[in-house]
């Protein structure tokens, strides 16, 4: 599983498909999916989105990239979908998160 997780982390900006990661670790997609959920506690797509959202938070805090650029850099073809996933994950839009975060840094 570690090899699969390293592959996912190295390819967050790519279109990550379960089938491709399974092939990378020489497992069938079905078996890989079952093992992944067993060991990670969540499904493959949820894990990928969780990793991407963690990276998005870092980029929003520590870069001046546009939200669209961050979305593209994390493998999202549509900025609107990126914003939707971010909001579902953190209950705030990327723009509001960035504004709140910058306000916190300005006060230090």
What are the residue ranges of the model-derived segments?
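Short linear motifs at secondary-structure transitions and domain/linker junctions
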Residues: 22-23, 36
């Amino acid at each position: 599983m570690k090899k699969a997780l390293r592959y996912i982390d190295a390819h967050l900006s790519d279109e990550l498909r379960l089938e491709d990661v399974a092939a990378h670790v020489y497992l069938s997609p079905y078996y890989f999916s079952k093992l992944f959920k067993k060991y990670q506690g969540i499904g493959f797509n949820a894990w990928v989105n969780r990793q991407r959202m963690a990276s998005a938070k870092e980029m929003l805090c520590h870069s001046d990239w546009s939200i669209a650029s961050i979305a593209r850099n994390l493998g999202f073809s549509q900025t609107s979908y990126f914003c939707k996933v971010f909001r579902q994950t953190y209950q705030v839009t990327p723009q509001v998160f960035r504004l709140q975060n910058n306000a916190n840094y300005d006060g230090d």
